[in-house]
């Protein structure tokens, strides 16, 4: 192989082309590659941050859900306790009212019994006086009659 002027010319042209490319073409290509690499790295970082944020948000949502369930259970428990308390209060009020009505009824019964006893005593006294008058055949005066009825009522 002979080195001739054509080969030297081609080598010089290639060297000029390489130098031109290194001076004017290569820097923008390298800059574009670096920018693209930076965008890709930023995108990956953003994706990682988004994944972490999503995980944190899911954990926070889960925690809030657990707290809400606990609060709901607590509210339900308090409601059950309050309902039981209200039922017990109503029972106690009903018991007190029943005792009051019972005591009032017993007092009325006692009063009716006493008035019936008094009426019966008066009738027994009148019958006793009437019987005594018939036996004795004479009339007893009103004062003696009242005294006799009071004595009999006290004895009965």
Curated annotation (Swiss-Prot):
It is a single-pass membrane protein. Its main location: membrane. Pfam families: ATP-synt_B. It is found in: Cell inner membrane. The chain crosses the membrane at residues 12-32. Keywords: ATP synthesis, Cell inner membrane, Cell membrane, CF(0), Hydrogen ion transport, Ion transport, Membrane, Transmembrane, Transmembrane helix, Transport. One of its GO terms (molecular function) is proton-transporting ATP synthase activity, rotational mechanism. GO terms for cellular component: plasma membrane; proton-transporting ATP synthase complex. The keyword 4Fe-4S does not apply. CDD domains: ATP-synt_Fo_b. F(1)F(0) ATP synthase produces ATP from ADP in the presence of a proton or sodium gradient. F-type ATPases consist of two structural domains, F(1) containing the extramembraneous catalytic core and F(0) containing the membrane proton channel, linked together by a central stalk and a peripheral stalk. During catalysis, ATP synthesis in the catalytic domain of F(1) is coupled via a rotary mechanism of the central stalk subunits to proton translocation. Component of the F(0) channel, it forms part of the peripheral stalk, linking F(1) to F(0). Belongs to the ATPase B chain family. F-type ATPases have 2 components, F(1) - the catalytic core - and F(0) - the membrane proton channel. F(1) has five subunits: alpha(3), beta(3), gamma(1), delta(1), epsilon(1). F(0) has three main subunits: a(1), b(2) and c(10-14). The alpha and beta chains form an alternating ring which encloses part of the gamma chain. F(1) is attached to F(0) by a central stalk formed by the gamma and epsilon chains, while a peripheral stalk is formed by the delta and b chains. This is ATP synthase subunit b.
């Amino acid at each position: 192989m002979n080195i001739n002027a054509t080969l030297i010319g081609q080598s010089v042209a290639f060297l000029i082309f390489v130098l031109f490319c290194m001076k004017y073409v290569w820097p923008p290509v390298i800059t574009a590659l670096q920018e693209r690499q930076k965008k890709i790295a930023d995108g990956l970082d953003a994706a990682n941050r988004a994944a972490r944020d999503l995980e944190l948000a899911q954990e926070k949502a889960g925690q809030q859900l657990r707290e809400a369930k606990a609060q709901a259970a607590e509210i339900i428990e308090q409601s059950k306790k309050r309902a039981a308390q209200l039922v017990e209060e109503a029972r106690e009020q009903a018991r007190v009212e029943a005792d009051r009505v019972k005591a009032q009824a017993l007092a009325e019964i006692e009063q009716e019994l006493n008035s019936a006893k008094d009426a019966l005593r008066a009738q027994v006294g009148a019958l006793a006086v009437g019987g005594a008058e018939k036996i004795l055949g004479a009339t007893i005066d009103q004062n003696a009659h009242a005294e006799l009825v009071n004595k009999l009522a006290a004895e009965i």
